[in-house]
Design a protein with these regions (language model features):
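Short catalytic micro-motifs in class I SAM-dependent methyltransferases
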Residues: 26-30
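Conserved class I S-adenosyl-L-methionine
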Residues: 50-77
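A short glycine-rich, Lys/Arg-flanked "PGG" loop and its adjoining helix->strand segment in the class I
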Residues: 35-50
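Conserved Class I S-adenosyl-L-methionine
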Residues: 82-166
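A conserved beta-strand element that flanks and buttresses the S-adenosyl-L-methionine
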Residues: 23
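Conserved SAM-binding strand-loop segment of SAM-dependent methyltransferases
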Residues: 1-15
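Conserved acidic residues
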Residues: 20
Length: 166
């Protein structure tokens, strides 16, 4: 049995040492002040508490970026590289000052996309400039992606989570 409540992790509305466990699922890279958030998380964890936070690394879904770049080199799917703010590579050094033990647990996974439409839908949903270059050439882009996915399009998943012990 457990309870949950959404709130900003930079100002956690609970007294000290209240929680056995805290989970942050792909959220720390959005924190404006990561140090403040980690201090708050540590503050509200019980002495034997554990903090789980998921992240991804630089290689996560890199094939999709290469795909759109091969179609048009001006396309950038995301101007922000969130994994540089908090990710697999820098997570230990960012979490280490706040926790006695930090461990990375890789989630072994990949994707094999065999249809163009789901991949195109994902690409068009990204936060970059892709719509500026794809929408006017949609039929051409769809044909390009269809050829790439015809034999299966492999996508690397470079993700997992950190377990952090107080």
């Amino acid at each position: 049995r457990f309870a949950f409540q959404p709130f900003g992790c930079q100002e956690i509305p609970f007294p000290d040492e209240q929680f056995d466990m805290i989970i942050a699922n792909h959220v720390l890279f959005y924190c404006e002040d990561l140090d403040k958030a980690l201090k708050e998380i540590k503050r509200v964890l019980k002495p034997e508490g554990i903090f789980f936070c998921s992240a991804y690394g630089a290689d996560h879904m890199e094939e999709i970026s290469r795909l759109v770049q091969d179609f048009d080199s001006r396309i950038i799917l995301s101007a922000d590289k969130l994994y540089e703010k908090f990710g697999r590579e820098n997570g230990p050094s960012l979490l280490g000052p706040y926790f006695s033990r930090v461990e990375w647990h890789r989630y072994e996974d990949s994707l094999l996309v065999t249809q163009a439409e789901p991949l195109i839908a994902y690409i068009l949903s990204c936060h970059g400039n892709q719509n500026q270059y794809i929408l006017d050439r949609y039929k051409e882009f769809r044909s390009f992606v269809s050829k790439k996915t015809a034999g299966g399009f492999y996508i690397t998943k470079d993700a997992g989570f950190f377990s952090c012990h107080k």
